[in-house]
């Protein structure tokens, strides 16, 4: 007797967000184990899982039946399966129509929509009860879809379930609609039931105790083997066999999805390839005015040949058109990534770095014929003007042929723990406490940390919360839009993949993310935003206005000694790429003295080189402490620039090619295998080939294995050399601007917020340390952006000195429109009073409160915070007509200062500082630590400045506000902490044991005291932490009131993820309150993490 056969046609993956509880890979692996022949993936109103399901089906040898569950109006649900490519296109268009109609995250479709787009679709009705409504729907189904109409039979595990199936089967037979068995799978194994209950509760925003019948009523929605399905549906053998029948009828496969890039007609009468070649050769003299080097010419011919064979010319023309448009609108942009390996991209001006100077010209790192993947060019634009470029792409290529990729937002450790805790009914303060102990996105909280928090791990709900949170990590939560990854198509894009509206206006996204489109081989062009480009563009504009000289990234003064002297001292706060604490600790040791040193600096502080044990050998050789030896001349040619240490991906590929006889494509496969060896295990075959090849070419076997170990260590994290050079160019330009024009640099970076590693408070403090005068926000002198004001003084060179005037953008809660109204209203004359500003600018009182809390009335109107707030409360909507007429005749305003004077108690100095931080994000008054210094000195806690001056080996204790916690990706797990007090900054190093011992303090404290040993290595000074103390409570004594205001934090703190709030957003705020004298004012430090 033959084994029972069955195809499961109703499988919901976790891409039905907060419904399914298993991934595609888990489902297809289980299907293979159970002997199921095919799986029909039918997520709700979505094809989001299809690329992953396609990949999983190929990996496990189980056939994929592409489908979708449609929830129509009138509570009607059907399963649909496209039989061919044309039907698939219609299904994509149908979903796009519903998503456009429903708005973000929703899909609204009717029966008429289904009928209109239903040609070629098999439609399976999902019916619950055999009632009159079901009979009507069956008749309509049969009339519309004839032999493509079916009805599903599924167990609901309720009383009279068999009777329900019998009645449904009889009703379908009477209507001439065949039935098919489905199991309505939500998870692959029974053990996943609890997680499915949890995501259901998250979806309904309720606890597990409140869920009731919103949970599945039974635990039967797991995948079952064919034998079990035949046992359960023994009375319906035909319905079981029809599962295979439908699978056979649905012949469409994702491999039929032929993507065609739009044909670019840049030059009429020429093909895309001819146009590209013509444009490239015409652009050569501009890039190489002294003639094209033979090596570069050979590479250019090779690249054009490869592009021609792979038919990628149109792609290069599109990217070129986008870059040319940006430059025509004076938008600063620069290509990066592996595209910087391409001479074509350099010649056309897409990238700024000549790959002939900075790489081994391994074009296959960018485009490989054997890899079968399309190229991927990343171009960075000013983050504040990138939207102009995005809208130009939509307008040029058409909204039916252009869309952004989506990003699948997945659960991270902290979010998973928080949501699971809420579902299980754990107290909110407990879940906050637990989640605050999670460092990385994939990290959980272990039993040890729970015990340190004095919690009982024997508590069933607490233990269950950890188990379920670990299962939830990595599960899709919702779709969001890619930062700028565009997919363009020759034909309608919505016939390839469903399109939905993005959260932002005038944008649309496809349902698939960047990994999905790699599977189906769509080409993507990345229009990315880089804050430092906005900063540099603003800086160049200010510099041109001052000096008349025009600067850009490609024309910076080369190898400026003063700039590199500043870099060597690690005076790089605010610059690009070399501003992190890990980078700053490396700079005085590596001592970059020319541009290529900066390229190495950018690349070396990366997890790969650290894990590959390449940093210390390079530093020793650079300092002359270790000889630079090469086994063979081939290695010297490849590694000479990096002193015999492989730091870049191109070097790894060139070693394989020149020393082990790899082809260019094999070398690229080696690089890709290194990037995934932990998961795939394909690295072993390349190890044998590399070692054997090197030995055959005369290398010692031990040496060959050592080289492989180094390459293996940095494969997944190593920079392409030309990519590092692209970043180094911006790093150098930002450092040059900071070195020679610190006032312009400070202004530009403040006007480009949010961006960078540090908060405005640290940027302003650093500028003041460099002699820049910074002036407060002022209602009569501040524009929206920060500006430069002449001081009437001269610098050492006899040039005019300028002060930075903080702009209205710094005032939290003040909208852009209200700021513009204020600036426009004072064009003729300055404001004379609060009342004058209110009446002339026409802004609401809430905007005035924002200004008063930011102390913006003090500089010109001499009104302190409390006086200004009191004046705002005294404002009248309209004066009486008689007094108004008199005021007009007198050309005067009705001043609030004519009210009876009230003696308001002035705020304390500490209270003013707290208010500054709370409403401007920084203070130009005393540092908060100044008010605590006397108490700290009594405890023999020294200042940060004193700590960094003492001799090596000194034991001491210092304290400060926590600016940054950084955990570079190294095997040793060292953690950097940066503390700030009124005298400066101190850097602490925590080894793993210390971190684990004081984990709660490290992750939670806003102010810490650190006792440890000073370690000096040249100009690098670290405090190696031995003991940490949480001093956050001390900050409560700085002010007078109990309202907690956050001390602004840098985006560089790795513990906190995401972007800081845009303080320009309009927010509802309470009316100004009375400031009671006995209230306690407090600073609350919230730091953030940055990997």
UniProtKB/Swiss-Prot annotation:
Annotated coiled-coil segments of the chain: none
Record-level Gene Ontology MF annotations: 3'-5' exonuclease activity; DNA-directed DNA polymerase activity; nucleic acid binding
Compartment(s): Cytoplasm
Cellular component annotations (GO), alphabetically ordered: cytoplasm
Catalytic activity as recorded in UniProt: DNA(n) + a 2'-deoxyribonucleoside 5'-triphosphate = DNA(n+1) + diphosphate
CDD domains with a match to the protein in the record: DnaE_OBF, PHP_PolIIIA_DnaE2
Region: Disordered, residue numbers: 1051-1080
SMART domains reported for this sequence: POLIIIAc
Keywords: Cytoplasm, DNA damage, DNA repair, DNA replication, DNA-directed DNA polymerase, Nucleotidyltransferase, Transferase
Reported function: DNA polymerase involved in damage-induced mutagenesis and translesion synthesis (TLS). It is not the major replicative DNA polymerase.
Recorded family membership: Belongs to the DNA polymerase type-C family. DnaE2 subfamily.
Protein name: Error-prone DNA polymerase 1
Gene: dnaE2-1
